[in-house]
Amino acid sequence: MACYIYQLPSWVLDDLCRNMDALSEWDWMEFASYVITDLTQLRKIKSMERVQGVSITRELLWWWGMRQATVQQLVDLLCRLELYRAAQIILNWKPAPEIRCPIPAFPDSVKPEKPLAASVRKAEDEQEEGQPVRMATFPGPGSSPARAHQPAFLQPPEEDAPHSLRSDLPTSSDSKDFSTSIPKQEKLLSLAGDSLFWSEADVVQATDDFNQNRKISQGTFADVYRGHRHGKPFVFKKLRETACSSPGSIERFFQAELQICLRCCHPNVLPVLGFCAARQFHSFIYPYMANGSLQDRLQGQGGSDPLPWPQRVSICSGLLCAVEYLHGLEIIHSNVKSSNVLLDQNLTPKLAHPMAHLCPVNKRSKYTMMKTHLLRTSAAYLPEDFIRVGQLTKRVDIFSCGIVLAEVLTGIPAMDNNRSPVYLKDLLLSDIPSSTASLCSRKTGVENVMAKEICQKYLEKGAGRLPEDCAEALATAACLCLRRRNTSLQEVCGSVAAVEERLRGRETLLPWSGLSEGTGSSSNTPEETDDVDNSSLDASSSMSVAPWAGAATPLLPTENGEGRLRVIVGREADSSSEACVGLEPPQDVTETSWQIEINEAKRKLMENILLYKEEKVDSIELFGP
């Protein structure tokens, strides 16, 4: 095998790494010592397993592959060390030429209970065996005059609608025929009274034949124009061939995006208002977003005023809800970034979906290919493991959300060629404590330490004043998205929603999701000890975190010199508490705290045990190496 290690398919590399990671430490170190003779570099790679939870075999092979090591060298080394099972994984793989084929149709015989991705894979397998496959079709709910102008491949009978768009499929055998079921999205769009399908003449007239004066932006896969129809503004996205695209890529891209758009119906997902599949061009029609993109507003494009913190947090909350909704439909967006978060006249975020993918159902379909110069523009929002391996999972979207949260928090662009490092993710991840400093992470949490440093160094100053606890909570949510491999979007959404409620000036009992230091499910366990960190329980510094501590350690109401309640958290809170939160107490008032002091070490251990049961931390991080 003359190919290089970095040319190994991702699924082969996955199997190999899983096998090698299961070796004893002695056997693995023996293998690694033949690859790397520099003990410092070897220890650095070995520490990644404990600090970052990555596959050390993958890191080792990546390091070796970047030095032009071949697959044959790897096989020879494995055989020399008598690691025959790992060697056989590579030997079972045979390089095969890439097969390019159009997106297959959905045959009528597909059973409704099968997921869409499984149906697609089945059709692909049939095509590889030489069986003919029909072109995919997408019916529009428009009127018959509009249908007269549709191309042939867009004029199927209603019973041939893709099964993936059927939302109310019956489960019992005595239910009505599947062919009469209409998707919710199509019902909603039909009620609007306008046809989804636009004729070529309508699009040309609305955009003045795609006049360059109407161009809003130019992207990798499409040009965006502004147009009008019946006095109403629209945005037209005209797909175009790229220098590296394969033949027929526009048709595949068009059909895939249309399929995704028709499945989505969420207030924070950009709706599709129409489409046009003409001979000269393919175009989508979207509502016009008066406030442009989040990226433009964060960078002050067009002289716009900086977004205030309540609006920033509200946009982040809407973005996270949109991604969580897509993941619930088993859709991976794969291109979440601030330029794809559009803002309407009310600054409500709408997530555009130019590169959405259906979640895969088998190992081979979990990987994607992307040309290098296209990847560079999106690499600022992609995790390192995706860039190296190409494995497309929900983790990619969650990581991208973390970068957008960081952009909102810091006001720093995700990519700046005049900055070192160029990518914001590298700037932030460099602030993760080193392996030596992270020894204290079992007590305070790496994300919390990282969040505090980010707030101290990079917090946006031009958007007004942000309470310290809110800033750290928002930064911690971003760090969880960037660092953890199994982050729960629901957990991050809850934290951002709590910050949003706080900034709106309301009392809230939303849980802090275990993100802020000093909270947790075990914090109500009384423990008397001498080694208590009194600084975290100091009553004089508890004003900033009082609204958030209510979910774990309820505070007793205290009175100022005038006899008015200063802080109230719990069922006894009345209407006067909301107006008094955040007021500084008179200097001559003595505060008394009746809180139970908690053994910090034991509390943190119990929290980690709960996280371990939820599979959010591994045993090495819990008990140490």
UniProtKB/Swiss-Prot annotation:
Domain Death: 13-94
PROSITE patterns assigned: PROTEIN_KINASE_DOM
GO BP, sorted A to Z: canonical NF-kappaB signal transduction; inflammatory response; interleukin-1-mediated signaling pathway; intracellular signal transduction; lipopolysaccharide-mediated signaling pathway; MyD88-dependent toll-like receptor signaling pathway; negative regulation of canonical NF-kappaB signal transduction; positive regulation of canonical NF-kappaB signal transduction
Cysteine disulfide links: none
Listed InterPro entries: DEATH-like_dom_sf (IPR011029), Death_dom (IPR000488), Death_IRAK2 (IPR042151), Kinase-like_dom_sf (IPR011009), Prot_kinase_dom (IPR000719)
Record-level Gene Ontology MF annotations: ATP binding; molecular adaptor activity; protein heterodimerization activity; protein homodimerization activity; protein kinase activity; signaling adaptor activity
Record domain Protein kinase: where: 210-489
Amino acid composition bias (Polar residues), ranges on this chain: 169-181, 516-526
CC annotations in GO: cytoplasm; cytosol; endosome membrane; nucleus; plasma membrane
Assigned keywords, A-Z: ATP-binding, Nucleotide-binding, Phosphoprotein
Family matches, as SUPFAM superfamilies: DEATH domain, Protein kinase-like (PK-like)
Family note: Belongs to the protein kinase superfamily. TKL Ser/Thr protein kinase family. Pelle subfamily.
Domain notes: The protein kinase domain is predicted to be catalytically inactive.
Role of this protein: Binds to the IL-1 type I receptor following IL-1 engagement, triggering intracellular signaling cascades leading to transcriptional up-regulation and mRNA stabilization.
Name listed for the protein in its UniProt record: Interleukin-1 receptor-associated kinase-like 2
Species per Swiss-Prot/TrEMBL record: Homo sapiens (Human)
